[in-house]
């Protein structure tokens, strides 16, 4: 693993300051990290990436998951109290772009049984793809979704596309500074692992709450 460009204490200090500078709100604010990159040509497709990162301390809040399935997979989803979208409902949603957009916005993650993926790609691909929310695919015989769901609850999806900056949620203001800092380290390590020249391509890192100002992590 590459040497971290920032030590843990510097990250903890930035988290502490970001939380302190956030005005109290009537909701629990998320904490986000923004990683600015340099010396990277995003016109070359091989330099762009999508990543799934499992945060050691989770996201600190509930994650909304929908399951697109019939049969065994749908039953497994209902047992876990997850929202289920049947193949028939999928056909209905396909007729309404407004409904499809609403669906893509409402859920953080989708799980889908493999046989429905061609339809999902056709009907929902243009709404889920740009949001980096294409489903986790499972076989139609799967009867236990719990391991996948537990992993998704701790997962963040990040992508580097047209601009040299990567954003990721890394917790909430109610989590300890150390927990958030460790989550940030995990995200940074994942990003460094995708960069051709590793940590030397990280220009700066900022931490902020949903409504608060961005605080730079001192290098």
Swiss-Prot record:
Q: Which HAMAP family match?
A: Ribosomal_uL1_A (MF_01318_A)
- Superkingdom field: Archaea
Q: Which organism is it from?
A: Pyrococcus abyssi (strain GE5 / Orsay)
On subunit structure and binding partners, the annotation says: Part of the 50S ribosomal subunit.
Task: Give the protein's function.
Answer: Binds directly to 23S rRNA. Probably involved in E site tRNA release.
Q: What is this protein called?
A: Large ribosomal subunit protein uL1
Q: Which GO terms describe its biological process?
A: regulation of translation; translation
Listed PANTHER family? 54S RIBOSOMAL PROTEIN L1, MITOCHONDRIAL (PTHR36427), LARGE RIBOSOMAL SUBUNIT PROTEIN UL1M (PTHR36427:SF3)
Q: Does the keyword Calcium apply?
A: no
Q: Which gene encodes it?
A: rpl1
Output the NCBIfam families linked to this UniProt entry: PRK04203.1
- Give the GO molecular function terms: rRNA binding; structural constituent of ribosome; tRNA binding
> Which InterPro entries does the record cross-reference, listed alphabetically?
Ribosomal_uL1 (IPR002143), Ribosomal_uL1-like (IPR023674), Ribosomal_uL1/biogenesis (IPR028364), Ribosomal_uL1_3-a/b-sand (IPR016095), Ribosomal_uL1_arc (IPR023669), Ribosomal_uL1_CS (IPR023673)
Give the UniProt keywords, A-Z. Answer: Repressor, Ribonucleoprotein, Ribosomal protein, RNA-binding, rRNA-binding, Translation regulation, tRNA-binding
